[in-house]
Amino acid sequence: GIVVQTNPLYTERELQYQMADSGAKVILAMDILYPRVTKVLKDTKIENVIITAIKDYLPFPKNLIYPFIQKKQYGFSVKVEHKGMTHLFTEIMRVAETKPINLSIDIEEDLALIQYTGGTTGFPKGVMLTHKNLISNTSMCDVWMYKCVEGEEVILGMLPFFHVYGMTTVLLLTVMKASKM
């Protein structure tokens, strides 16, 4: 699959444009964004909606308390049910095959990511990046981090990963350096 990152602050119009323009077939979103996601599905090619929640990654008893905090913080709580095109990430992971998928990619030609521009000159444009593009960009960052010891660093991610700079300089570099985040 090809990743299309999106800004969680996008309006319905911006999200709908990006999903339709990219031809996305699956959207993975946090539960608090579910109401917005459901409003943009028409006029897109989205076939599956996968929803995850912060509470899914909290230890007991915080996972039970969090929905109350969420309701207080956002003014609503979201109850998402596994039905139709909507799937819960935790359920997918529970029933997923544990055997690795064997697939072949051409790192120079196959797209890994469609990164949308900021849209400063009109509608945002999808920039097509191959696997090799991402490796090259991350390798350039790696040169700047020459003092990092592979496998021993802890990287604090303060940049948004949906932005290409945060994805490259934090997320992908952390993987390349075998670091913790």
What are these model-predicted stretches?
Residues 92-99, 127-148:
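Conserved structural elements of the adenylate-forming
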Residues 7, 158-163:
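Conserved AMP-binding
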Residues 119-120, 178:
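Conserved G/P- and acidic residue-centered "switch" motifs that form tight phosphate/ATP-binding loops
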Residues 2-91:
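Structural core segment of the AMP-binding/adenylate-forming
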Residues 79-116, 123, 148-154:
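Conserved pre-ATP/AMP-binding loop-to-beta segment of ANL
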Residues 115-118, 159:
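Active-site beta-alpha turn of Rossmann-fold NAD(P)-dependent dehydrogenases/reductases
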Residues 135-154, 162-181:
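Conserved AMP-binding/adenylation subdomain of ANL enzymes
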Residues 13, 25, 109, 131-132, ...:
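Structural detector for helix-capping/boundary residues
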